[in-house]
């Protein structure tokens, strides 16, 4: 039975899930609007402060008006009590033939029926109560609703004081709040107490009217303040919004956008300052574009101009190298060094030309649909001798099935060749892992070494041109310092990603992620960039891949 009750409770609360989620969504939407709208915050803050001021002012004014009305009422009631006391003294002590109850009733009727008196009209209508407490052999006597008189007030009157008190009374002709004024009398009847009950219905109506009028005026005033705040905030926010829109268009490349200048106030000075800043930025951007164009043109022109003399030098060097056996050992060694440096110089010129094409935006893809595994094997064939010279073991892990992708095989092979050669340079004779994996949309290749690694922040710098983490390290691959910079440009040309991870002493990992179909956007990668801490060298490659790698090495 208990478990059933719990299930019912959970079901009842579970039904409120959509409501809670809806309220959460609404709250987030309102919070977003609040954070993004300066005008809304200004108007809301103005209304909040105005409402607080109106409430405080209304409370103070209402309290003062109420106190003043009641003060006038108490004063008029006190004067009426003085007149009533004289009337009661004359009636009660006039004829001894009447009984005490008759005298008290006659005095009460006289007081109540005295409506023509102008002075009584100032205090308003009232009811009278006459009380004579019992004293020894004399019995107590009273006239009027004596039960409505508070005992605390009677105690003050018995002590000979004229006092008043607010109380809620219920008589034959009235029910509600009233002012009760009590006073002792000086008549032949000792200890005679006189009480006048003044209804406060007129005063209540007046106070309610005052409160209603002030509330209505406060609402109207609050609405006017809201309209004024909206107009003022709009006057302030409009130039800011205009500046924001123009800044966005300026960031999009519309360098001629400027803010309109109206008047000579603070907003006008803001517009002038903004326009001056935009003009300065536009001028600097144009200068940088001109410098960049000059730099790219210089790089391209120099690379082309150097090709002609380099070709001549290459022909002469090859001729000398072909007859190097006839030279003495020193000249033979010099010839070999010259040929090697010419090879490196030619590679540098080719890389500079490729960089200039990327900078000029004229690099194009020659897309083919092929099995990307063959491209990986081709890259291994080109750098296998480097691994053999450095004593580095290359492990390959690729899928058994074909991985068909629409890529430029020359550029992808160059990316992989640069990554593997870079890993061999920094592996410190430790293994280098090459892994490939694919999903429905993308294919990824990671190159992992366990060498010196990367310091924090260097995972971005490795793709900079001519950047080296350790200038004293010798490149086994004879690179130019532009390989990774060209590789990341080639990856972007495929709409792919080239990312790096590394830690000092733990090695580095480079991940290339490409779309299987040209034009698709890469959002995820089938391989992780940061390896798990317990990760060991990858599983052994297939027989076909092993044979291909062994042949290349």
Swiss-Prot record:
Q: Which GO terms describe its molecular function?
A: ATP binding; phosphorelay sensor kinase activity
- Record-annotated HAMP domain positions: 234-286
Catalytic activity reads: ATP + protein L-histidine = ADP + protein N-phospho-L-histidine
Looking at the UniProt entry, the stretches that span the membrane are: 42-62, 213-233
The subcellular localization recorded is: Cell membrane
UniProt-listed Enzyme Commission number(s): 2.7.13.3
Feature: compositional bias, Basic and acidic residues: 544-553
Source organism, top-level taxon: Bacteria
Protein topology in the membrane? Multi-pass membrane protein
Q: Which residues form the Histidine kinase domain?
A: 301-518
Modified positions (Phosphohistidine) in chain numbering: 304
Q: Name one GO cellular component term.
A: plasma membrane
Q: Where is this region: Disordered?
A: 523-553
The knockout outcome noted for this protein's gene is: Grows poorly with filamentous cells, often with bulbous regions and a chain-like phenotype indicating possible defects in septum splitting and cell wall metabolism. Increased sensitivity to lysozyme. Decreased expression of the MtrA/MtrB regulon genes dnaA, ripA, and fbpB.
Gene3D superfamilies annotated for this entry? 1.10.287.130, 6.10.340.10, Histidine kinase-like ATPase, C-terminal domain (3.30.565.10)
Give the matching Pfam families. Answer: HAMP (PF00672), HATPase_c (PF02518), HisKA (PF00512)
What's the main place this protein lives? membrane
Q: Do you know which InterPro entries this protein is assigned to?
A: HAMP_dom, HATPase_C_sf, His_kinase_dom, HisK_dim/P_dom, HisK_dim/P_sf, MtrAB_MtrB, Sig_transdc_His_kin-like_C
Key words of the record: ATP-binding, Cell membrane, Kinase, Membrane, Nucleotide-binding, Phosphoprotein, Transferase, Transmembrane, Transmembrane helix, Two-component regulatory system
Q: Which PANTHER family match?
A: HYBRID SIGNAL TRANSDUCTION HISTIDINE KINASE C, TWO-COMPONENT HISTIDINE KINASE
Reported function: Member of the two-component regulatory system MtrA/MtrB. Probably functions as a membrane-associated protein kinase that phosphorylates MtrA in response to environmental signals. MtrB may be active only at septa where it promotes MtrA phosphorylation and MtrA regulon expression, probably playing a role in cell division.
**Subunit comment:** Interacts with MrtA.
What's the protein name? Sensor histidine kinase MtrB
């Amino acid at each position: 039975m208990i478990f059933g009750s719990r299930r019912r409770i959970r079901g009842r609360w579970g039904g409120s899930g959509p409501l809670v989620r809806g309220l959460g969504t609404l709250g987030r939407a309102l919070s977003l609007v609040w954070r993004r709208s300066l005008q809304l915050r200004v108007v809301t803050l103005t209304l909040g402060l105005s409402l607080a001021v109106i409430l405080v002012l209304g409370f103070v004014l209402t309290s003062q008006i109420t106190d003043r009305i009641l003060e006038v009422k108490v004063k008029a009631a006190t004067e009426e009590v003085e007149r009533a006391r004289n009337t009661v003294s004359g009636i009660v002590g006039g004829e001894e033939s009447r009984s005490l109850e008759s005298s008290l009733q006659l005095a009460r009727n006289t007081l109540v029926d005295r409506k023509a008196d102008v002075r009584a009209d100032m205090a308003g209508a009232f009811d009278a109560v006459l009380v004579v407490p019992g004293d020894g052999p004399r019995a107590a006597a009273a006239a009027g609703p004596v039960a409505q008189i508070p005992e605390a007030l009677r105690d003050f009157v018995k002590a000979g004081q004229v006092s008043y008190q607010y109380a809620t009374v219920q008589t034959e002709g009235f029910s509600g709040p009233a002012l009760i004024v009590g006073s002792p009398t000086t008549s032949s009847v000792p200890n005679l107490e006189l009480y006048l009950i003044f209804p406060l219905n007129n005063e209540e109506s007046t106070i309610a009217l005052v409160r209603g009028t002030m509330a209505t005026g406060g609402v109207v005033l609050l609405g006017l303040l809201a309209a004024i705040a909206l107009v003022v905030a709009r006057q302030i926010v409009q130039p800011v919004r205009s500046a924001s829109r123009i800044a966005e268009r300026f960031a999009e490349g519309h360098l001629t956008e400027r803010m309109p200048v109206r008047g000579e106030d603070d907003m006008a000075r803001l517009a002038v300052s903004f326009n001056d800043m935009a003009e300065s930025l536009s001028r600097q951007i144009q200068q940088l574009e001109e410098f960049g164009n000059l730099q790219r043109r210089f790089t391209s022109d120099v690379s082309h101009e150097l090709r002609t003399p380099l070709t001549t030098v290459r022909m002469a060097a090859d001729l000398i190298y072909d007859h190097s056996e006839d030279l003495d050992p020193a000249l033979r060694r010099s010839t070999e060094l010259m040929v090697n440096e010419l090879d490196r110089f030619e590679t540098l010129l080719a890389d500079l030309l490729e960089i200039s094409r990327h900078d000029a935006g004229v690099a194009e893809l020659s897309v083919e649909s092929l099995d990307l595994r063959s491209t990986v094997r081709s890259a291994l064939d080109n750098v296998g001798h480097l691994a053999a010279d450095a004593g580095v073991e290359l492990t390959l892990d690729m899928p058994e099935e074909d991985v068909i992708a629409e890529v430029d095989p020359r550029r992808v092979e160059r990316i992989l060749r640069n990554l593997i050669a870079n890993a061999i340079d920094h592996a410190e004779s430790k293994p280098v892992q090459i892994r490939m994996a694919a999903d429905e949309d993308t294919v990824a290749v990671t190159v992992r070494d366990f060498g010196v690694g990367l310091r924090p922040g260097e995972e971005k710098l490795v793709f900079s041109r001519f950047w080296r983490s350790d200038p004293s390290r010798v490149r086994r691959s004879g690179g130019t310092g532009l390989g990774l910079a060209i590789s990341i440009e080639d990856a972007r040309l495929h709409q792919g990603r080239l990312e790096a991870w590394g830690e000092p002493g733990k090695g580095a990992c480079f991940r290339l992620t490409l779309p299987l179909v040209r034009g698709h956007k890469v959002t995820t990668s089938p391989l992780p960039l940061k390896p798990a801490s317990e990760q060991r060298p990858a599983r052994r490659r297939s027989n076909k891949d092993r044979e291909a790698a062994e042949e290349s090495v």
